[in-house]
């Protein structure tokens, strides 16, 4: 196989998708997320944390103190890709279910609460009136 064929085969190979968490082993705080590529997500988060560029400032702070040894990267639920189905919507639904418990916000975790639809619409409207 040449390089071009290998690249095409890689892109066409279905990736495992699902919900994951990054758990602080010291204080049990968690970051919960979902992804279409479970294989790559942990590498992405490790890279961001090692480069001190993770979007969660609290997680970054704790990572800087404890390092990789202080955290566990765990798959909470895996979802099989299905044709004729909005896989991203399924993932978002699953993530929302996992966010209900343990509600990893504030003292319990590193996630930021999702805004309600009304809050998002209000923000969009406010930006339009400012511009």
Predicted feature residues:
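Structure-specific nucleic-acid interaction/processing domains
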Residues: 1-32, 36-127
């Amino acid at each position: 196989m040449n390089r071009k064929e290998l690249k095409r085969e890689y892109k066409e190979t279905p990736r495992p998708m699902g919900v994951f968490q990054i758990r602080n082993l010291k204080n049990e705080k968690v970051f919960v997320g979902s992804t279409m590529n479970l294989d790559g997500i942990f590498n992405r988060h490790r890279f961001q944390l090692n480069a001190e560029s993770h979007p969660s400032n609290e997680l970054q702070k704790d990572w800087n103190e404890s390092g990789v040894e202080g955290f566990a990267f765990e798959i909470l639920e895996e979802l099989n890709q299905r044709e004729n189905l909005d896989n991203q919507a399924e993932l978002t639904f699953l993530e929302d279910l996992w966010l209900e418990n343990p509600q990893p916000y504030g003292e319990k975790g590193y996630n930021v609460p999702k805004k309600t639809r009304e809050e998002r619409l209000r923000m969009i409207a406010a930006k339009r009136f400012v511009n």
